[in-house]
Amino acid sequence: MEEKRKKIRVLVGGVFDILHVGHIHFLKQAKELGDELVVIVAHDETVRMQKRREPINPAEDRAELLRAIRYVDEVYIGTPGTIDMELVKRIDPDVIAIGPDQFFNCEKLKEELRKHGINAEVIRIPYLYKSDRAKTSKIIQRIVETFCE
């Protein structure tokens, strides 16, 4: 009888506001690290704190869009503030993939995960697609320049 291998769960987090091709490339690369891709979407309050702006789309809409992407298996909305380690623990990832433009110190994150009993590998995804078309802030800037001036 063939023994079933454990599925490798990959976790990513992000704002994912104004979904663009850079997000798709990131999600695809993250999915390639395992069998299941779980996404934690930043809570609206977290967006306000980190980006110092209102989210363009509410978290529920961003989550729904992500659920429609073929690389994504599960989506959760995070809690306001910092990383919800209890949610991460419940998800039980084998790998946490960090985006190329996310400002995380991978070593500090690993240390914080270990403190909470989470033994996941942390991998930074390199830029595969680097373009102004793949940055939400640049997209917003182009919209303003095109339609508001």
Swiss-Prot record:
Swiss-Prot/TrEMBL GO biological process terms: FAD biosynthetic process; FMN metabolic process
Catalyzed reactions per annotation: FMN + ATP + H(+) = FAD + diphosphate
Documented EC number(s): 2.7.7.2
Uppermost EC category: transferase
UniProt pathway: Cofactor biosynthesis; FAD biosynthesis; FAD from FMN: step 1/1
Positions that bind ATP: V15, F16, H20, V21, G22, H23, D101
Family: Belongs to the archaeal FAD synthase family.
Role noted for this protein: Catalyzes the transfer of the AMP portion of ATP to flavin mononucleotide (FMN) to produce flavin adenine dinucleotide (FAD) coenzyme.
PANTHER family: FAD SYNTHASE
Name of the protein: FAD synthase
